[in-house]
């Protein structure tokens, strides 16, 4: 997808006073030693690098907020392979760093669900394809699961920032009041399913334990 298509997607979307726009992102890697070995297939995990992301956003009033997200890059789980562990880890660290620029330079304004969905399912596949073609030419490509995990701390930080920007717990931000579109914009039921996502929002599915 081109940048013009990406921007058109959001320019044509309804908006609200709760919308945010990503300004910048910052990525750090945190080494973690596990308390006990974890086995994934034929490989054993005793340490992991966690990707920690901070995301700065701006609301429609010009106020800025920062959200945080973190996830372990469990190489053995997201990319099972005979390729040496070090090579796979280095590729994931590099790909994570590449995503920082992609998440910062998108121009989208909206709800975290809307921005995140387009980044994950429109931009991420293109970035992954380009990376595998240019950086992994002749080598085993980074799989889709690994790419999603690399993107997940950015998505977590985006949702965290949205809640902070609107002075609400994140899980209270998924109702009709805050979302510009319903779940039918993201989900399509199978042909034999008696399900309609029109008029439904994530808040209708999530159950908060108070």
What do these predicted ranges mean?
Residues 168-196:
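Electropositive nucleic-acid engagement tracts
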Residues 14-54:
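Short, Gly/Pro- and small/polar-rich lid/capping loops
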Residues 49-59, 69-73:
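Short beta-strand elements
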């Amino acid at each position: 997808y081109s940048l013009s298509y990406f921007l058109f997607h959001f320019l044509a979307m309804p908006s609200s006073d709760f919308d945010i726009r990503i300004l910048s992102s910052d990525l750090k890697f945190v080494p973690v030693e596990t308390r006990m070995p974890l086995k994934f297939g034929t490989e054993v995990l005793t340490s992991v690098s966690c990707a920690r992301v901070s995301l700065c956003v701006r609301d429609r009033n010009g106020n800025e907020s920062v959200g945080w997200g973190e996830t372990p890059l469990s190489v053995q789980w997201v990319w099972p392979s005979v390729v040496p562990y070090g090579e796979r880890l280095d590729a994931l660290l590099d790909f994570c760093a590449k995503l920082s620029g992609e998440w910062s330079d998108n121009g989208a304004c909206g709800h975290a669900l809307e921005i995140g969905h387009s980044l994950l399912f429109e931009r991420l596949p293109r970035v992954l394809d380009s990376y595998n073609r240019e950086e992994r030419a002749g080598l085993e490509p980074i799989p889709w699961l690994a790419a999603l995990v690399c993107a997940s701390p950015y998505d977590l930080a985006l949702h965290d920032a949205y809640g902070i920007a609107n002075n609400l717990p994140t899980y209270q931000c998924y109702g009709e009041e805050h979302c510009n579109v319903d779940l039918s914009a993201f989900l399509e039921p199978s042909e034999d399913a008696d399900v309609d996502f029109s008029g439904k929002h994530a808040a209708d599915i999530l159950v908060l334990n108070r």
